[in-house]
Structures are given as C-alpha cells and as structure tokens.
C-alpha cells in the first residue's frame, strides 16, 4: 500500500503545462549524481590514497581492472556533464526568475559550493602533475586570510607542504561529501515542491497544471537518453577530451608546469582570481564569484519575474553568458597581455551583471508606469 501511495503522489504531482526543456536539467543532475556515486564506489575499491601508489593505482584501474577504463572515464567525463547541467540549471534559474523561490535557490547555491569542493578534491586524487600543482595553488590561497591563514593551510595540508596526509584527507572528503550532496538534493527537491516550480511566463502556475506522469516523465526520459548517448559517445571516442596533458605525468614537486590550471568547469572562477594582481583581493573575488548567487533573490526589484518580457535584461543576461565563456577562455591562456586585460574587463562585467540587475528592474518599473 505505501508503494502505491508513493506512485500515486509521483503520478499526480501537479506541474505547470508550459514548462520548457530548460526545466529538464534537474532530473539530469539527479541522474549524474547517481552515476558519479556508482562509478566512484567501484573506483574506490581499487584506488590507493598514497602519494607513491595513487598514480599507479589509476593506471592499474584503466589497464587491469575489468571495465576499469569505462568506470574511470564515466566518472571523469560524468563530472564534466554534471557541471554542464548545473550551469544550464543555474542559468535557467536566473533567466526565468526561479530564484524568487528563496529556500530552493539558497539550498541550490549551497549544493553548488559542495559540488565544487567535491570536484576539486577529486581532481587531486590521480596525483598527476596538474593535480598536484592545482592543489598547491588553490589551497595556498588560504594563506591570504589575515592571522589565521598559515595555521589553516598547515591544518588542511596535514603538514608544512602537500604530502601523503593531504592526499588521504582529500580522498576521505571526496568520498564523504557526495552523501551530503545527496541529502541536500533531497531537501532541495522537497523545498521546490513546497511552493512548486515556476514557468517560462513567470506567472502563477496554479490555474493550469497537469500530472507529472506520463507527460513530464517521458519529456525527462528523452533528455536523459540524449545526455547518456552524448556521454557514452565521448567516453568511447574522445575519452581524453577534457584531460590536461600534464596530468599524464606523475606529480613532481620539483618541476612546475608552464601553465597551472584547474579543470575547465572551474576556469571562470580561476580567471577571476588571476585577473586581480593582489592575493587577498583575488581570493575574495574568487569566493564572491560563487557567493554572489546568494544575493540574487534579495536584489530582485522588477515587477516581472521572468526575463521573457524584459528585452534589456535579456541583452544583459546573454552578455553575462558571453562574459562567462570569455573568462573561461582567458583562464586557459598565459598571464600576459592581452589576456590579462581581457580577463580583467570580463571579470568586471561578470560582477556588473549582478549589480545592474536591481537597477534595471527599478528602471523597467518606472518605464511601465509611464
């Protein structure tokens, strides 16, 4: 009987009739997280969190473990898929005003921070050259914190440099954080269904709703099939497309790579960090590039929820999207002109979007009164 009730709830869950494909990314993210937990579990069975054996254990997984190459590639490329989906999911939230459902938005932003931390810890685990140096650069930012910085860095490293204790605790954190993500995802979904999802028009959906099943289940399944097909195509034909060539060499603390950079999904934040010549200023800008999302629900001034009928805001949104891509691109380049100038201008425009959002809303309200 309880199972029937659950199915009834799922089947009769009322959803707005007009939600578009942009609303499918939530279910895709859920699938990504399930895939990551499963593949990660099998990888953890064969991985060794030791600086002398970590790199060799990855090679052992790929070469000797049955379907180990598939697990490793699904896990690595699955992380990229996860971030593609989450960035689209956030962009949809910004465009259609989903952030006005404050509890859902704040829990979602917390999820993003947890996901970024998990991905960072995971990037260090293969103990390749780029893994080691990316970890060194990013964890070193803690030293910019006045008074506490050096103590916190030593505490995080488990010593006076990145070494075996660092790798062990990063593996422990990479293993435990996904369980926190799953718990918070459940809360995120519960909070969403407390108020119900918005729709492209930004109007009240209560007047026109349909059952979730079969309409939206099939709609979700189509996008999931497309995502899994794309994932398997990349895994089969281009498994190293997102990898850094330096990471195919074992970590060597005595040799610094020519250009240190994290995974592609962190490049926008890394580009903002690099654009500021001051260490503390850069660390603050890096933190703010993500934390600024927390302020969005509290700075909405427009009488319209969605950007669908706000042409000025649409222009600003797509400029913001282009800015995001430009910062990502400049972060892959060396720290030299013209890339430094471009990244500084792009970083400024990135934050200007969040500042001009309430100003534009206020101006639109004035125009509508005329």
From Swiss-Prot:
Keywords, ordered alphabetically: Electron transport, Heme, Iron, Membrane, Metal-binding, Mitochondrion, Mitochondrion inner membrane, Respiratory chain, Transmembrane, Transmembrane helix, Transport, Ubiquinone
Cofactor mode of binding and number, as noted: Binds 2 heme b groups non-covalently.
One function term, GO molecular function aspect: metal ion binding
Cofactor(s) listed in the protein's UniProt record: heme b
InterPro entries (alphabetical): Cyt_b/b6_C, Cyt_b/b6_C_sf, Cyt_b/b6_N, Cytb/b6-like_sf, Cytochrome_b, Cytochrome_b_C_euk/bac, Cytochrome_b_N_euk/bac, Di-haem_cyt_TM
GO biological process: mitochondrial electron transport, ubiquinol to cytochrome c
PROSITE patterns: CYTB_CTER, CYTB_NTER
Cell compartments where the protein resides: Mitochondrion inner membrane
Membrane topology label: Multi-pass membrane protein
Binding site residues for heme b b562: 75, 174
Ranges annotated as spanning the membrane: 25-45, 69-90, 105-125, 170-190, 218-238, 280-300, 312-332, 339-358
Any Pfam family the entry gives: Cytochrom_B_C
Annotated binding of heme b b566, by residue: 89, 188
GO cellular component, one term: mitochondrial inner membrane
Domain of life: Eukaryota
Stated family: Belongs to the cytochrome b family.
Misc remark: Heme 1 (or BL or b562) is low-potential and absorbs at about 562 nm, and heme 2 (or BH or b566) is high-potential and absorbs at about 566 nm.
Complex and partners: The cytochrome bc1 complex contains 3 respiratory subunits (MT-CYB, CYC1 and UQCRFS1), 2 core proteins (UQCRC1 and UQCRC2) and probably 6 low-molecular weight proteins.
Function field: Component of the ubiquinol-cytochrome c reductase complex (complex III or cytochrome b-c1 complex) that is part of the mitochondrial respiratory chain. The b-c1 complex mediates electron transfer from ubiquinol to cytochrome c. Contributes to the generation of a proton gradient across the mitochondrial membrane that is then used for ATP synthesis.
Protein name (Swiss-Prot/TrEMBL): Cytochrome b
Protein's organism: Chilabothrus angulifer (Cuban boa)
Designated gene of the protein: MT-CYB
